[in-house]
Amino acid sequence: MKYLTTENAKTTKGESLGYLTAILYLAPSALSGRNVCSHASEGCIASCLNLAGMGAFSNVQDARIAKTRAFFANPRAFVEQLAEDIAAAERKAERAGLELCVRLNGTSDLPWENLGGEAGVCLMRRFPHLRFYDYTKNPARVRAYLAGRLPANYSLTFSRSECNGEIHFR
């Protein structure tokens, strides 16, 4: 199963700016029976992008649930498949003359900086020449990012919600 997508309305906009974006969409929150959004608020769950666009179709939801279950069944094998998908997306970007950017938390909030494949190395360190970016509601991850403890090619943006507005970063 191919885990990353490079073809949707959001990624097409980036192509006009010189970027090919590869995004991993999992079943958000606890939709698959396993929670991939540990800091999701009620408002976050209610307004989740999971059902936007093609996500409204049952086959897309089924695929997201299957990917999420595959991740929890064998995280190392899942990361290895992601590495293959990233390499394929990189070749696609090179052929098109685009720069590849990777977003692993399209509809999740997992600490990919701590998840390694068979070699135990996270994807950002395996592909140090690529840009990775994500949004997170996890303040500990943002603090680690701001302190320079995450891979240099990984950017995190704090995602505000109705119950985390009191959190400030300096």
Could you say what each language-model-derived stretch is?
Residues 1-170:
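Class I S-adenosyl-L-methionine
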